[in-house]
From Swiss-Prot:
The chain crosses the membrane at residues 16-36. This is ATP synthase protein 8. InterPro entries: ATP_synth_su8_fun (IPR009230). GO terms for cellular component: mitochondrial membrane; proton-transporting ATP synthase complex. Its main location: mitochondrion. It holds the Pfam family Fun_ATP-synt_8. The gene is ATP8. It comes from Vanderwaltozyma polyspora (strain ATCC 22028 / DSM 70294 / BCRC 21397 / CBS 2163 / NBRC 10782 / NRRL Y-8283 / UCD 57-17). Keywords: ATP synthesis, CF(0), Hydrogen ion transport, Ion transport, Membrane, Mitochondrion, Transmembrane, Transmembrane helix, Transport. GO terms for molecular function: proton-transporting ATP synthase activity, rotational mechanism. It is a single-pass membrane protein. Mitochondrial membrane ATP synthase (F(1)F(0) ATP synthase or Complex V) produces ATP from ADP in the presence of a proton gradient across the membrane which is generated by electron transport complexes of the respiratory chain. F-type ATPases consist of two structural domains, F(1) - containing the extramembraneous catalytic core and F(0) - containing the membrane proton channel, linked together by a central stalk and a peripheral stalk. During catalysis, ATP synthesis in the catalytic domain of F(1) is coupled via a rotary mechanism of the central stalk subunits to proton translocation. The keyword Oxidoreductase does not apply.
Amino acid sequence: MPQLIPFYFLNQLTYGFLLMTILLVLFSQFFLPMILRLYLTRLFISKL
């Protein structure tokens, strides 16, 4: 069972943490402001 090898566990933990950090940065920098701008645009258009 490779899951019981500590190096395998640390490798999986490191890459999982790295992937979550990269996804968090991408979402906070690019995707969420784009969704917010789209929502605000729809809100302003509907109030006209």
